[in-house]
A protein has these predicted regions:
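Basic, Lys/Arg-rich alpha-helical nucleic-acid-recognition elements, primarily the DNA-binding modules
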Residues: 1-23
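General helical secondary-structure elements
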Residues: 2-3, 14-16, 30, 35-38, ...
């Protein structure tokens, strides 16, 4: 299976983030996806099986996990990209850390696309606009490479208020205990 970089027409590079993730016991996309589910991406729990040892947020912060899932050097996986979008929207993420990682990892275009989708569905969430202010607009990701933006949200057809589409960004649930 080709990598996301290959689908984007980019060359792969030696990734410091990928090396850090591998050193933390996360050698591939599947292990990153398992960790995302363990860290609260329960919406995707049927996507992966098994568990992985969580190296801890001090060693692998949620920002690293998000950018890792959206990183272009791994095997291409729409499910990993959807989980990466969810982890990117984690409530306590620092946009400055995400921006630094995006630059360092050549993930700016992908993260910009996700942030644009986030702003479309959550126009008052400051995190998305902070990302967009800090990311260069160097062209679009080709259509069909990333999941459709509606795959990053949960949509309802009928609510207590009646019929109508209500969208909510899928993000990790707060874990207690």
């Amino acid at each position: 299976m080709p990598s996301l970089f290959r689908r984007l027409g980019m060359t792969s590079h030696v990734s410091p983030l990928r090396r850090r993730l591998q050193a933390a016991g996360l050698p591939d996309t599947q292990s990153l996806m398992r960790l995302a589910v363990q860290r609260g991406c329960r919406y995707y729990r049927d996507t992966v099986t098994g568990t992985v040892v969580d190296p801890g947020k001090d060693r692998v912060p949620d920002e690293d996990l998000a950018v890792g899932l959206l990183h272009g050097s791994w095997e291409y996986s729409p499910a990993a990209l959807r989980m990466g979008a969810a982890m990117l929207g984690a409530r306590d993420n620092d946009p400055r850390k995400v921006l630094r990682l995006a630059r360092m990892e050549r993930a700016e275009a992908v993260i910009r696309e996700v942030a644009e989708a986030g702003l479309r569905f959550e126009p008052t969430h400051r995190f998305w606009s902070c990302l967009l202010e800090g990311l260069p607009d160097r062209g679009r990701v080709p259509t069909g490479v990333l999941p459709h933006p509606t795959r990053f949200v949960a949509m309802t057809g009928i609510t207590r208020e009646g019929r109508g589409i209500r969208s909510q960004w899928i993000r990790p649930e707060e874990l207690h205990g």
